[in-house]
């Protein structure tokens, strides 16, 4: 069972936390991480893009000029794709992109991603994360103190001060523990957990 240092906001170690093997020291299953990520990104797609075909655009179906004798290339309809305002040939049509993944496999993928980040020493645990007032400068100073950037912050319950202090900082995302997902875990270089969030995540993923 791996252990990790717990820090306060001044980067002083205030304790140690034992991490669950099943969540933070699991086998890294790259095929499951790839599948879970592909499914998450696919499910974001609305699939509503559509172009009109020659049968759907407005316009006459009459032959624009006679077949022979004009010197022009033969044409059958002004709604054909080669005409301005004509229909689109082989254009996109509405499509269902939704994919599904069973709970056990999805949990295993998230555990693999967390274990990968843990093995790469990219996880930091805080005893708590809160600010006495809304201050972007205070949040930036906190990030500099820990020498981290491009971070995902996972809390069990974040305050309004924390949310408003970090929202204008680029490459920082704040999530509650129940919104943890494979894409954000793999996207961000560092992950900051509160101690309560670690326990909440372990409780959910160990079910």
From Swiss-Prot:
Name of the protein = Large ribosomal subunit protein uL4
Q: Name one GO cellular component term.
A: ribosome
Q: Give positions of region: Disordered.
A: 50-75
Under the heading SUPFAM superfamilies, the entry gives: Ribosomal protein L4 (SSF52166)
Question: From the record, what ranges are coiled-coil?
Answer: none
GO: which molecular function terms?
rRNA binding; structural constituent of ribosome
Q: Could you mention a single GO BP entry for this protein?
A: translation
Q: What does this protein do?
A: One of the primary rRNA binding proteins, this protein initially binds near the 5'-end of the 23S rRNA. It is important during the early stages of 50S assembly. It makes multiple contacts with different domains of the 23S rRNA in the assembled 50S subunit and ribosome.
Q: Which NCBIfam families match?
A: rplD_bact (TIGR03953)
């Amino acid at each position: 069972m791996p252990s990790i240092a717990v820090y306060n906001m001044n980067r002083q170690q205030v304790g140690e936390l034992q991490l669950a093997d099943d969540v933070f020291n699991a086998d890294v299953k790259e095929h499951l991480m790839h599948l879970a990520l592909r499914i998450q990104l696919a499910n974001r797609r609305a699939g509503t893009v559509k172009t009109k075909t020659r049968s759907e655009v407005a316009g006459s179906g009459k032959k624009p000029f006679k077949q022979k004798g004009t010197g022009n290339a033969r044409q059958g309809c002004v709604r054909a794709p080669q005409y301005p305002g004509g229909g689109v040939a082989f254009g996109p049509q509405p499509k269902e992109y939704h994919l599904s993944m069973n709970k056990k496999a999805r949990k295993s993928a998230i555990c693999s991603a967390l274990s990968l980040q843990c093995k790469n020493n990219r996880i930091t645990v805080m005893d708590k994360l809160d600010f006495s007032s809304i201050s972007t400068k205070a949040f930036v100073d906190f990030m500099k103190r820990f020498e981290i950037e491009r971070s995902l912050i996972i809390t069990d319950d974040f305050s309004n001060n924390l949310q408003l202090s970090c929202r204008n900082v680029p490459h920082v995302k704040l999530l509650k523990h129940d919104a943890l997902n494979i894409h954000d875990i793999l996207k961000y270089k560092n992950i900051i957990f509160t101690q309560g969030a670690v326990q909440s995540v372990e409780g959910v993923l160990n079910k």
